[in-house]
């Protein structure tokens, strides 16, 4: 009985392996309560699934999409474009405006920006710490 049904389905789905995947997925849907599109005739769910594919009451493309969706673990989410996200600017004008746009706390601290070269020159001009008696022993 199932062999005849498989032969009928080969016209709709050329690949037998894909047919097995689709029919198995449809059989699981039927066992979980999906409505039948053909009469059961005392057949089991895999045979009913093959008959549905053979009679074209459900399309293989729809089954394939449902199968792919059921196997997906992560759903792709569209994220905003990188240009849409405002970039922080390191210009002095932007640094002067940023604290004014902040919450307005009286304790806001503003830091001066300096280049890496200025920072290195400042570190070179620092005197090394003097040794104390505790460090010498």
UniProtKB/Swiss-Prot annotation:
Keywords: DNA-directed RNA polymerase, Nucleotidyltransferase, Transcription, Transferase. Coiled coil: none annotated. SUPFAM superfamilies: RPB6/omega subunit-like. GO terms for molecular function: DNA binding; DNA-directed RNA polymerase activity. It is an enzyme of class 2 (transferase). Residues 110-121 have a biased composition (Basic and acidic residues). It catalyses: RNA(n) + a ribonucleoside 5'-triphosphate = RNA(n+1) + diphosphate. Promotes RNA polymerase assembly. Latches the N- and C-terminal regions of the beta' subunit thereby facilitating its interaction with the beta and alpha subunits. Belongs to the RNA polymerase subunit omega family. The RNAP catalytic core consists of 2 alpha, 1 beta, 1 beta' and 1 omega subunit. When a sigma factor is associated with the core the holoenzyme is formed, which can initiate transcription. HAMAP family: RNApol_bact_RpoZ. This is DNA-directed RNA polymerase subunit omega. It comes from Methylobacterium sp. (strain 4-46).
